[in-house]
Design a protein with these regions (language model features):
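Conserved alpha-helical scaffold segments that buttress catalytic/binding sites
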Residues: 1-148
Length: 148
């Protein structure tokens, strides 16, 4: 965001994290920090508003403001699932999807998968599955690989 918007967000108590942090500390560390901040602030649940232009336009071209070097689905999907699983969500929205500028319908498919990942996180939370980075052992190759 521009500086005035960023200042307003800080005045409202919003936490922000930027790509520079991810580049310096790694995606998992920044996610750990963001989740810790939400929990320490007393959040019982989150409302997720996902602006689809955070996804790299190679994967989500159908938006009004495509942002080069955005998140890939491999980064974004686990992030959404993890937020819904570890903190819990009360609702979500995906905004800025414009199918009129995406003849391949790619953006709608990515947006749909984002919703599926959040719903999966909610189901994992309700089922009491283990914490961060949980992967189904049968699908994660545990029968072929030694896990730490």
């Amino acid at each position: 965001p521009d500086q005035s918007t960023h200042d307003w967000m800080q005045d409202q108590g919003m936490q922000t994290h930027f790509m520079a942090e991810i580049e310096r500390y790694g995606f998992d560390k920044v996610m750990d920090t963001a989740i810790d901040q939400a929990l320490q602030a007393g959040a019982e649940h989150l409302y997720i508003s996902l602006d689809v232009d955070v996804i790299d336009p190679a994967f989500a071209p159908g938006t009004g403001t495509p942002e080069p070097a955005g998140l890939t689905p491999r980064e974004g999907f686990p992030m959404l699932r993890r937020l819904a699983h570890e903190v819990g969500i009360v609702g979500a929205e995906i905004v800025e999807v414009n199918p009129f500028v995406d003849p391949g319908y790619t953006t709608a498919l990515v947006a749909n998968r984002c919703l599926i990942e959040m719903i999966t996180g909610v189901a994992m939370r309700k089922a009491g599955l283990p914490g961060p980075h949980y992967l189904d052992p049968g699908r994660a190759g545990d029968r072929w690989y030694q896990t730490p």
